[in-house]
Amino acid sequence: NLMQFETLIMKVAGRSGVWYYGS
């Protein structure tokens, strides 16, 4: 579901040090 996908993006973005979500 969309919320799970958004959480995954947030985790990946945080780990890479780049915030993609909402850019």
From Swiss-Prot:
A GO CC term assigned to this protein in UniProt: extracellular region
Catalytic activity: a 1,2-diacyl-sn-glycero-3-phosphocholine + H2O = a 1-acyl-sn-glycero-3-phosphocholine + a fatty acid + H(+)
Location(s) in or outside the cell: Secreted
Enzyme Commission number(s) from the entry: 3.1.1.4
The record's free-text note on cofactor binding: Binds 1 Ca(2+) ion.
Tagged with keyword Metal-binding: yes
Lineage: superkingdom: Eukaryota
Post-translational modification: Contains 7 disulfide bonds.
Keyword entries, A-Z: Calcium, Disulfide bond, Hydrolase, Lipid degradation, Lipid metabolism, Metal-binding, Secreted, Toxin
Entry keyword Nucleus: no
Name under which the protein is recorded: Acidic phospholipase A2 Ts-A5
Organism placement in taxonomy: Eukaryota, Metazoa, Chordata, Craniata, Vertebrata
